[in-house]
């Protein structure tokens, strides 16, 4: 177990998020194995492991060092075809999966959650090795949310159902909620385990089958979970996992004529491509959770200490690699100077380093491409006239670490105020009135999330209604629960994940009407 100082550090991390997971337990964190053994690096189809048909592999890299962890089978169109064929067979009428009681689907999901909990320490270490996020976060935050998500949807398995309908005439009418069928799911690298759970939970609870493409940057934890899916007792073909690249494996899923639905989390640019491919093929249903440039509005009456800490967390959590990061911090002018001063001090105190060290708050960026992209945005900010207040460069000689960076005097037209940076770069903007900040906050192609910090309930309610965003947090940030839907307006995507709303995208509603001799009330 971690010593008391390490546990205190874990508690500090959780206080920053102030219940990112709605009710994160403060608990002892087992010491990690910093070199976890790699058990699975192949393609998972029909509950079996396969090399890629092409025999190609790709390296997955430790972002803390730049060293190759291992090579992983590189799936492409032929492998996706084989996975879809297996999924389609598992979905045939009369198959073991289709014949399974809804309550038993819930039992399997609960069993999967139990197995993940059993191997939680290993999975947290593997996630940190492959992704770079602090181990304390992997264990206390990501894995906790994974377990809650799977167990939440396990509970829905036998409770999401149709209705009887009192139509006119001598008829009996009712609805059925039926599974869509073969669901293609494409998950990102910033929260590999969590995004896998967000996708699998509602799909499996409602009786679908899955072909999942995992990110080439972070395939390892998803592949380990694949083996737990088999151990839990899911029939062959119900879940198939293909590691590979977006332009090959991802594109094959999006355009496949025998895939009934695709769910994607990632960039808006790729979301466009998936939407087009889905439309050009078989008009498959699409759920997209895309980019954001979320406004975080600090009113002059806000609790300053809390607002500074939460604004810091809103931007820097997960190395800034969050689609809903509070990446436009709007501060009312009469507290602007003090807020900026405190925010810079907080950023300078942020501990960057080895993600397996319990004191670390910030690990590396995911890869060299993102590392260079973020440094390019920092250069752009300086060139366009924003004031660099701290950070601005690499934080280590090895790996993809970037200093916590804060810009002041940011204007709406600057590149760093318009585009998603996806890194530890905070932009602070000044405003005068509520009406002004509403207009500026909504003047974005994105609409994923927003936040308001104020002690005035009228202001909070007014801003919550006015902001064009799928989620608005009041006096908090990044508070998620499996019960609450998440998704975006505008170019931040379509559809919702989590909660009861998250089940809708995975079901078809069928109306059945039966002629009866006589209907009585």
Swiss-Prot record:
Protein name: Aldehyde dehydrogenase, mitochondrial
Disulfide bonds, paired cysteine numbers: none
UniProt-annotated location(s): Mitochondrion matrix
Coiled coil: none
UniProt-annotated site: Transition state stabilizer, residues: 190
EC number assigned by the record: 1.2.1.3
One BP term from GO: regulation of dopamine biosynthetic process
Superkingdom of origin: Eukaryota
The organism of origin for this protein: Sus scrofa (Pig)
Active site as annotated: 289, 323
Enzyme class: oxidoreductase
Catalysed reactions, semicolon-separated: an aldehyde + NAD(+) + H2O = a carboxylate + NADH + 2 H(+)
PANTHER family: ALDEHYDE DEHYDROGENASE-RELATED (PTHR11699)
Gene3D superfamilies tied to this protein: Aldehyde Dehydrogenase, Chain A, domain 1, Aldehyde Dehydrogenase, Chain A, domain 2
Molecular function per GO: aldehyde dehydrogenase (NAD+) activity; carboxylesterase activity; phenylacetaldehyde dehydrogenase (NAD+) activity
Function: Required for clearance of cellular formaldehyde, a cytotoxic and carcinogenic metabolite that induces DNA damage.
CDD domains: ALDH_F1AB_F2_RALDH1
